[in-house]
Amino acid sequence: MKLVKYFLQKKSVTILLLVLVLGGGLFSYVKMGKLEDAPFTIKQALVMTPYPGASPSEVQSQVTDVLEESIQSLGELYYLKTENRAGLSKITVYVKKEIRADEMQQLWDKLRRKVNDVQSKLPAGAGPSVVNDDFGDVLGVFYGLTGEGYSYRELENQAKLIKNELLRVKDVAKIEIYGVQSPTIDVILNPSVMARSGITTADISRAFDAQNRVVDAGGIDAGVNRIRIESTGNFYSLDDIRNMTIVSRTGEHFRLADIAEVQESYQTPPSNKMRINGQPAVGIAISTIPTGNVVDMAEAVKLVIDRFTETMSEGFELQTIYDQGYESAVANQGFILNLIISVVTVVAILLFFIGFKNGILIGSGLVFSIFATLIVMLSQGIALQRMSLAAIIIAMGMLVDNAIVVSDSALVNMQRGMRKRVAILRACSSTSLPLLAATVIAILTFLPIYYSPHITGELLSSLVVVIGVSLMFSWVFALTQTPFFIQEFVRRPRPDELKAALFAGKYYDKFRSALRWVIRHRYATIGCMVVMLVLSAWSFKFIPKVFVPALDKQYFTLDMWLPEGTRIEETDKMVMDMAAYIRGQEETEMVSTYVGRTPPRYYLSNVSFGPQSNYAQILVKCKTSKLSRQLHARLQDSISLKYPEPLIKVNKFELSPLTEAVIEARFLGPDPAVLDSLVGQAVEVMRRNPKVADARNEWGNMSMIIRPVYDPMKAGALGITKASMMESVKSINDGLPVGVYRDNEKKVPVLLKSGNVDITDANSLGDFSIWNGERSAPLSQVTERVETTWEFPQVRTYNRQLSMAAMCGVKPGHTMAEVHGEIRKEIENIRLPEGYTFFWDAQYKDQGEAMQAIAKYFPLAFLALVVILVCLFGNFRDPVIILCVLPLSLIGIAVGMLLTGFDFGFFPIAGWLGLLGMIIKNVIVLIDEINVQHRTGIDLYTSIVEATVSRTRPVLMAATTTILGMVPLLFDVAFGGMAATIIFGLTFATGLTLFVTPALYSMFYKVKGK
């Protein structure tokens, strides 16, 4: 107690330290980062490898498998998933969840080396591979640029000017431009003119190669100087290309413009497209440096953009699509308001229970604990965000609990006639160790979450740290600031004010009577509790299970897939029509569409799809979050009825990454046909369940392909190679690259395209003329046949095994756990041939991994808890009593979940762990008080009764402050379930502390009731 004495005697030091805490807390609040949600690390990387002309199966066997063999030697590898489409290998590398965030960059460097080591083993024409390890970066400030009457090229140029301005803004890390259409120079050949002139495509290719090649012209010596000679002839304008000379086989010279049309165009088919409210657009997505403040960065960006828009040409318009800075500021303001309401509520309750002066005394300790916690948060780089602010609110009741116990004990000692300082020191000495043990145990209950390597553990890590730090500060201030304030501001009762009986009155008498009855009927009481526990466990089957709750935002998204093989232009038409329909709803403020692939990751938990020509995403911004909920619910029910052809998913924003489907039954094996059969059976099971939505095969529908089967004999006689045949075919639509046009710093490909052709099927393709440089022949004369066939548009693997999944969603009003439970047995009973395996993927796998990650550290937390309790009490019976109380907390939780209708998931589980800490804290102090009174010579029965009576006021105060302090969180979509868990659980736990604990104590110590 020397520390307590020091702070009581050294007033100046105490006041200075408290002022420093207040000043440091205010400074920290101003300086610390502000975020919308807690950051977490996406422990994935993408390896993309082009292989033009290869089928999905060829990509998988010749490219992907080679890369996977090298990558799998990474010791940190968890598993690999691949998606192989025509001409493109896409490998997603998942690393072990135990890998720390600060080790990720070194790991990605190792991955790059593994990928680079096998580039020489890839087939000719494949590669190079690109390792994308920053696709998890958040570009949270997202603008869209539109320009009525402007081309995509002009939009791109304007976006680049804006990008150059924004890169100079403080805390801007990188800027990505989305929706840019790659420019081309199309040389559209006229077959009839070429036939008359004798010009072939080979002649044109040779001319481009000769003129566009960069040649070193050397230099000349001029006295003491060496003067470099610059080669010319490069293309710098369209006229340079049009005026290029083409020499025919007969030696005649022609201008290219005489035999072909030269025009500016864009890549066909485009890789992606973006629109805002139906207008063509390009996106400008901006990320913050890791140590930056996104709120400040977003405000600085807005100032630059506001200034820049004043100088833009008329017609250009910049619109905010998503502003993480604004969203963070709004979220912080909402939570700060909730925090203020909680603090005011707690202080008001204290004033009601113990009067103005004592209430302010204890309430001030709460403020000091919060401000000291802010200092630590700043020093540890913990930003103000949803989790850290919620942690302070969750810890609110526990923060005042220590001060309540110390001050109540000191006040009781003074009522017993002790001098003020003696009463304070006696209170601190008798409660410091039990309160420290209880505080440490309350922190230990969160240990499994803190050490969980899963994303959910990382998501909640700041919540655990803030709760732990604030609880320790509450203990420190309870033994320093609280005694000091009692000494300075609380008057010692006069002799005539001393009470003969401290806990007298009709309410105390009624409580004593009830307590004595419980002790007399302890076995019946405990039996009733056990029955209630069994009933509550049974009632959990009626509580919806949703692992991570959705967020309440103005935004939601729609993901749309048309049948595989759909042209991107058709996808764009469909999504434009759908966006126009959504834009016509009264709740809508803005609609932006993204065709071909998802936009940059403007929100951390967003999922990436694409490149896929049949895919599109719609981002809907509503006028308010309430209207967003209304429109989201309505579209869930109606959008698929209005647009039956595509698969449509309507998604709310969530705290953790979404999976491609809610439920995935994944089959692994060597034969795609067998996998297709197994998945078909699983899909049929899903479709029979009325709660299932959009049951489908992960590989999609079979796509039509046209296959010209090259005939070496026939083609060889005509001198036509397979390469020249395929190059000619490519010129029909995509275009054959023959040169480069230099447009400032950009190199624009020059493409040869065949004009006046109308090819839509195998028959018309067979009539198309193929050139060999000397002559032409119809395609049908150089092939065995031109056939139409079908193929899977993609081939997927899991850990180097062919992998195919039956996927489905869940209809509104139902949950994954509910539907999975209904279809699980039948799908698991599907007979698997030898060599084939099955497992549940997606949300089921993710949730199982999260729970396993938490359960992994439960034994450690439990062992630490038991060791502390045994060391504190010096016996086994008291710890066993405490452990027997803990399961009974589920009774209150079950009642709360059923009454409020909240889903039970990861956050309520975290709330339950915190609740256990609160219960343990109360029971420790109660049992310690029983033991203290018994050691003074009071019989054990009386000690049980009187100790419980003496703890009634502090227990009720702590419980009431916690319960009412949590009320603001009840209305938060993310934390409502957690708040309900603590509120109802603690309400029931208060009864456990005051009635069940004495009953258990009397039973374990064989104390007879009177």
Residue ranges and their predicted role:
Residues 321, 328, 332, 407, ...:
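Helix-loop junctions and hydrophobic alpha-helical segments within the transmembrane domains
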Residues 58-132, 192-213, 234, 569-658, ...:
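Solvent-exposed, membrane-proximal periplasmic/extracellular interface segments of envelope transport
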Residues 396-410, 431-451, 458-498, 618, ...:
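Transmembrane alpha-helices and their membrane-interface boundaries in multi-pass membrane transporters
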Residues 1-34, 431, 498-549:
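Signature of alpha-helical transmembrane segments and their immediate interfacial
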Residues 16, 55-62, 99-110, 139-142, ...:
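Solvent-exposed, non-transmembrane alpha-helical starts
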Residues 6, 37, 48, 90, ...:
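Extracytoplasmic/periplasmic membrane-proximal domains and adjacent transmembrane bundles
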Residues 25-31, 344-411, 469, 864-951, ...:
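Hydrophobic transmembrane alpha-helices and their membrane-interface caps
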Residues 12, 20-54, 116-123, 449-458, ...:
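Transmembrane helices with small-residue packing motifs
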